[in-house]
């Protein structure tokens, strides 16, 4: 795997196998982007996908910064408002380090 797009496709497939339903990907606003939008039971799930081919300079999880979390939250709120969605949501991270996948639910 060499691109972010491939990582997002792998993440989507992995999450669908875990029972989540795909809704959208790469939702972009001027102030932030949502990698994956999924549904899981009654929850809307906003998934940040992080990918690293090696961990020499830190793993995929270390790549998430507070400012990025702010942008993701803002984009998710905007998505919910635009689509008139009034339901619980959560923010997950799917970190891919080489061939290892770590799915963290409700991270922020």
Curated annotation (Swiss-Prot):
MF terms (GO), sorted A to Z: nucleic acid binding
Domain of life: Bacteria
Protein species of origin: Shewanella denitrificans (strain OS217 / ATCC BAA-1090 / DSM 15013)
Protein name: UPF0102 protein Sden_0272
Family annotation (HAMAP family): UPF0102 (MF_00048)
PANTHER family reported in the protein's UniProt record: UPF0102 PROTEIN YRAN
CDD domains: PoNe_Nuclease
Family, similarity comment: Belongs to the UPF0102 family.
Pfam families from the UniProt entry: UPF0102
